[in-house]
Amino acid sequence: MTECFLSDQEIRKLNRDLRILIAANGTLTRVLNIVADDEVIVQIVKQRIHDVSPKLSEFEQLGQVGVGRVLQRYIILKGRNSEHLFVAAESLIAIDRLPAAIITRLTQTNDPLGEVMAASHIETFKEEAKVWVGDLPGWLALHGYQNSRKRAVARRYRVISGGQPIMVVTEHFLRSVFRDAPHEEPDRWQFSNAITLAR
């Protein structure tokens, strides 16, 4: 999958609701509840614990030194009443770097990752997200989810705790929900790590 990061100028052209969601640095489901005017629920599509982190670029972002086991979690955020699919997300979580209570809650409930982390009171730092327009993740179609568009705005960020990366989260904002997104011309996107939305 090729990722062409969006410049600040391209991000400012996105629909207001989508800009709010991209800029959200807290619990995405809380913001999405307001933007979508619906109770947002988590549907776990698939999750798996890897005893050793696979050789994938996303796993490498967790760091190779003593990463231990990794929980790979695919989820959909959707409206309870509308049943609209809002976000498709993948999380890679270094579970040996977190308390067992967090892992138990993640693997035995449908609670949103952000809510689980907020309730744990663990001090974390969310790195600045990289934003791009790209293909929807392949796992979405493999599990029977269809979307009228094949591309979406996405963001990826790492969460750090105790000086170590504990998770990498990739979120795809499903374009059929956000109506006035930019034209899909991937060759126009400029590379940028800066997402300065508040000016």
From Swiss-Prot:
State the Gene Ontology BP annotations. Answer: chorismate metabolic process; DIM/DIP cell wall layer assembly; monocarboxylic acid biosynthetic process
The GO terms describing molecular function are: chorismate lyase activity
Primary enzyme class: lyase
Activity regulation reads: Inhibited by 4-hydroxybenzoate, but not by pyruvate.
Q: Which InterPro entries match?
A: Chorismate_lyase_/UTRA_dom_sf, Rv2949c-like
- At the top level, the lineage of the source is Bacteria
**In what way does activity depend on pH?**
Optimum pH is 7.5. Active from pH 6.8 to 10.
Q: What Gene3D superfamilies does this protein's entry cite?
A: Chorismate lyase-like
Identify the keywords attached in UniProt to this record, alphabetized.
Lyase
Catalysed reactions, as listed in the record:
chorismate = 4-hydroxybenzoate + pyruvate
Cite the EC number: 4.1.3.40
Q: Any further remarks?
A: Was identified as a high-confidence drug target.
Family listed: Belongs to the chorismate pyruvate-lyase type 2 family.
Protein name per Swiss-Prot or TrEMBL: Chorismate pyruvate-lyase
Classification from the root reads:
Bacteria, Bacillati, Actinomycetota, Actinomycetes, Mycobacteriales
